[in-house]
């Protein structure tokens, strides 16, 4: 357990992966039930559900072309804040066809683990496949459907608020005594802010002097 990662867990199911079409779902997710028919009923055989990047998201990102083909997987160590407008977060729900698994994913999975070991992520195999000239993996962006990845107690608390019945949600927000920034889609009309300050020029000046401001004051 302390020497492997999810690429090893998936490799244990190598035989079963090649027997039929597969839905791959990570176990730390909570999500709207509509995501299942959304991906299953889509006619494209190899899909990854993705969501436009928001500040709470962590882990593997992807970049898409105009046809929603995945052109690159961006691992956590290659994340660049200056590119966040181009990023989509993998929801970690995938649909793979038997043919794709048999002819591409499993062979690359075996080669990857032999070369780099078992302490890796299965998304890295997908990253290699996207470098091929004829990659068959597309993205299916969400359109506001709820989902959350739960890694700790704080994530669980946020997810319980997001998925609470509408009539219970406001009291749960208010129990937090702030921290609304963790909910990017929440508009807080009681928060005392000046929508005209800072202006764009001042923000650019602060960015330009950020290193000095951070380290010398």
Regions found by a protein language model. Name each.
Residues 63, 95-97, 149, 188, ...:
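Short, well-ordered beta-strand micro-motif
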Residues 164-216:
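N-terminal "arm"/small-domain region of PLP-dependent enzymes with the aminotransferase-like
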Residues 87-175, 181-183:
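Conserved alpha/beta core of the MobA/IspD/sugar-nucleotide pyrophosphorylase nucleotidyltransferase superfamily
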Residues 20-30:
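Short beta-strand-to-loop acidic/aromatic patch adjacent to the donor-nucleotide binding site
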Residues 1-20:
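Conserved N-terminal catalytic core of the sugar/cofactor nucleotidyltransferase
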Residues 56, 80, 101-103, 147, ...:
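Short, acidic Gly/Pro/Ser/Thr-rich loop/turn segments
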Residues 32-116:
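Conserved core of the sugar-phosphate nucleotidyltransferase
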């Amino acid at each position: 357990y302390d020497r492997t990662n999810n690429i090893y867990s998936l490799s244990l199911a190598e035989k079963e992966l090649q027997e039929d079409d597969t839905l791959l779902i990570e176990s730390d997710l909570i999500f709207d039930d509509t995501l299942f028919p959304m991906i299953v009923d889509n006619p494209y055989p190899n899909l990854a559900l993705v969501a436009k990047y928001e500040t709470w998201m962590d882990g593997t990102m992807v970049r898409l072309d105009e046809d929603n083909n995945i052109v690159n997987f961006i691992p956590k160590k290659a994340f660049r804040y200056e590119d966040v407008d181009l990023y989509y977060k993998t929801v970690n729900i995938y649909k793979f066809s038997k043919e794709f698994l048999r002819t591409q994913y499993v062979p690359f999975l075996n080669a990857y683990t032999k070369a780099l070991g078992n302490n890796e992520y299965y998304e890295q195999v997908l990253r290699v496949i996207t470098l091929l000239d004829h990659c068959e993996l597309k993205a299916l962006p969400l359109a506001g459907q709820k989902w959350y990845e739960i890694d700790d107690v704080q994530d669980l608390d946020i997810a319980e608020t997001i998925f609470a019945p509408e009539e219970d949600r406001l009291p749960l927000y208010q129990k937090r005594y702030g921290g609304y920034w963790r909910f990017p889609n929440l508009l807080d009309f009681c928060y005392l802010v000046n929508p005209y300050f800072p202006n764009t020029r001042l923000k650019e000046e602060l960015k330009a002097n950020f290193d000095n401001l951070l380290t010398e004051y």
